A protein has these predicted regions:
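Class I SAM-dependent methyltransferase SAM/SAH-binding core
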Residues: 50-105
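Short glycine-dipeptide loop
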Residues: 143-149
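A conserved beta-strand element that flanks and buttresses the S-adenosyl-L-methionine
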Residues: 117-120
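Short hydrophobic/aromatic beta-strand or adjacent loop that forms the aromatic wall/cage
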Residues: 205-207
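Conserved class I S-adenosyl-L-methionine
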Residues: 1-47, 60
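A short, conserved alpha-helix within the catalytic core of class I
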Residues: 125-138
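C-terminal alpha-helical "lid/dimerization" subdomain adjacent to the S-adenosyl-L-methionine
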Residues: 150-201
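Local beta-strand N-terminus motif with an aromatic residue
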Residues: 48, 93, 112-114
Length: 207
């Protein structure tokens, strides 16, 4: 598996279905973490003025940010970058960056962002949770001294999935869309603590 396996699912067609299936049906019924009740408020609470969104999906969350926000987008998938940029409004978008998050970011981005979000990125990345530590490290380098990295990921270990969630986990992991069967809150906290002094996690449903 490589990083591209998780990104391939996001074609122009699937992006049109993403909000309904992922943010609507799956978050509520499979993962027990309804988008508008939990994930959207979480996204907006920690949003800084100069923000980098990594793993942009359809840009749903970005449609709710203040007009004054400066937003940069990072994704391996050009279709996602273009869809999110168009949906959020080109006037808000400062940079569109096609980049593999396992690789160090361009030096010009270091120390630039007040906040960085990773919503539903980590569970799509190949490997176990410990191999994803470098993804956290690379993002941390792009934050200002008092910047915040935040996000959400679907856990596979240490949580109880319902039958719908179990089926989705099995299918997505078999297809390489997810790589999260052993991802746990404890493991996530560990890799965050390797790069940040102040770490806070909360589990809602299996997210």
């Amino acid at each position: 598996k490589n990083t591209d396996d998780g990104a391939k699912i996001y074609t122009p067609l699937t992006l049109k279905l993403y909000d309904w299936w992922v943010l609507g049906v799956s978050n509520r019924l499979a993962w027990g973490c309804p988008t508008k009740e939990h994930l959207l408020p979480h996204f907006l609470e920690h949003l800084g003025n100069n923000h980098l969104d990594i793993g942009v999906g359809t840009g749903f969350y970005l449609t709710h940010v203040p007009e004054s926000s400066l937003i940069s987008l990072m994704d391996l998938n050009e279709a996602s970058l273009n869809a999110a940029s168009t949906r959020a409004g080109e006037s808000k978008i400062k940079h569109k960056i096609s980049h593999d998050v396992f690789e160090p970011y361009p030096a010009a981005l270091h120390g630039q962002f007040d906040s960085i979000s990773m919503f539903y990125l980590l569970h799509c990345l190949p490997g176990n949770i410990s191999t994803k530590s470098c993804v956290i490290r690379n993002a941390a380098q792009d934050l200002t001294d008092d910047g915040t990295l935040y996000g959400a990921t679907i856990l596979g270990d240490g949580v109880v999935h319902n039958s719908f969630g179990q089926k989705m986990m099995r299918i997505y992991n078999q297809k390489g869309i997810f790589s999260n069967t052993k991802d746990s809150e404890e493991g996530l906290t560990h890799i965050l603590s390797e790069h940040f002094e102040n770490v806070k996690t909360k589990v809602q449903g299996t997210v």
